[in-house]
Amino acid sequence: MSKSRLTVFSFVRRFLLLLMVVLAVFWGGGIALFSVAPVPFSAVMVERQVSAWLHGNFRYVAHSDWVSMDQISPWMGLAVIAAEDQKFSEHWGFDVASIEKALAHNERNENRIRGASTISQQTAKNLFLWDGRSWVRKGLEAGLTLGIETVWSKKRILTVYLNIAEFGDGVFGVEAAAQRYFHKPASKLTRSEAALLAAVLPNPLRFKVSSPSGYVRSRQAWILRQMYQLGGEPFMQQHQLD
């Protein structure tokens, strides 16, 4: 290998190491800061906003109103747990059984990919990472998930998740969603309304709270049944999530 190539390789290696250190400090600081401070915006919100501007849509505003857990209806927390991650209170960030099932499903159905992300993983991804699928992003997501599971309580993870989750085009967080779709604060959401909001979470840009399809209504009904099976509102108190 020539001297010039060695010099370039050495420069690239040092640059990548420096970048990794900077990102580690940035993400570590973010995890520490947001363990107590409200989250002003997420990586997904920034990505959506920049994308809108690049496409000439200057009226788009990625909007979120931070609220604490005691300002959110217990039904809302229960609904997203029932819909997205029923073992949330038990696992350490990853649901191994669900991952194994998803891998087996994806091997059989290459055109219908199924995910197995927990609420903790989704929080890490939405807060700190870009959208998309890649092994690099999944690796970073795993590290960030371990970080927030180590530093944050389960209640804090759920609080952040509910405040940065996307519920529609430009609608981020449960408070903005409650005001937009039901004209009420998140604290007043009913069991049925909470289940409807949770029903669109797999793809809030495709599934609409304002005009729910038959599939969304079916998923809402399923979520309501799962909420009942989990034990209803007392579930949140029993696991110190309210």
From Swiss-Prot:
<dbReference type="GO" id="GO:0008360">
    <property type="term" value="P:regulation of cell shape"/>
</dbReference>
<dbReference type="GO" id="GO:0009252">
    <property type="term" value="P:peptidoglycan biosynthetic process"/>
</dbReference>
<dbReference type="InterPro" id="IPR011812">
    <property type="entry name" value="Pep_trsgly"/>
</dbReference>
<feature type="transmembrane region" description="Helical">
    <location>
        <begin position="15"/>
        <end position="35"/>
    </location>
</feature>
<comment type="pathway">
    <text>Cell wall biogenesis; peptidoglycan biosynthesis.</text>
</comment>
<dbReference type="InterPro" id="IPR001264">
    <property type="entry name" value="Glyco_trans_51"/>
</dbReference>
<dbReference type="InterPro" id="IPR036950">
    <property type="entry name" value="PBP_transglycosylase"/>
</dbReference>
<keyword id="KW-1003">Cell membrane</keyword>
<keyword id="KW-0472">Membrane</keyword>
<dbReference type="GO" id="GO:0005886">
    <property type="term" value="C:plasma membrane"/>
</dbReference>
<dbReference type="Pfam" id="PF00912">
    <property type="entry name" value="Transgly"/>
</dbReference>
<dbReference type="GO" id="GO:0016763">
    <property type="term" value="F:pentosyltransferase activity"/>
</dbReference>
<protein>
    <recommendedName>
        <fullName>Biosynthetic peptidoglycan transglycosylase</fullName>
        <ecNumber>2.4.99.28</ecNumber>
    </recommendedName>
</protein>
<keyword id="KW-0573">Peptidoglycan synthesis</keyword>
<dbReference type="GO" id="GO:0008955">
    <property type="term" value="F:peptidoglycan glycosyltransferase activity"/>
</dbReference>
<comment type="similarity">
    <text>Belongs to the glycosyltransferase 51 family.</text>
</comment>
<keyword id="KW-0133">Cell shape</keyword>
<comment type="function">
    <text>Peptidoglycan polymerase that catalyzes glycan chain elongation from lipid-linked precursors.</text>
</comment>
<keyword id="KW-0808">Transferase</keyword>
<keyword id="KW-0997">Cell inner membrane</keyword>
<dbReference type="InterPro" id="IPR023346">
    <property type="entry name" value="Lysozyme-like_dom_sf"/>
</dbReference>
<dbReference type="GO" id="GO:0071555">
    <property type="term" value="P:cell wall organization"/>
</dbReference>
<keyword id="KW-1133">Transmembrane helix</keyword>
<keyword id="KW-0328">Glycosyltransferase</keyword>
<dbReference type="GO" id="GO:0009274">
    <property type="term" value="C:peptidoglycan-based cell wall"/>
</dbReference>
<keyword id="KW-0961">Cell wall biogenesis/degradation</keyword>
<keyword id="KW-0812">Transmembrane</keyword>
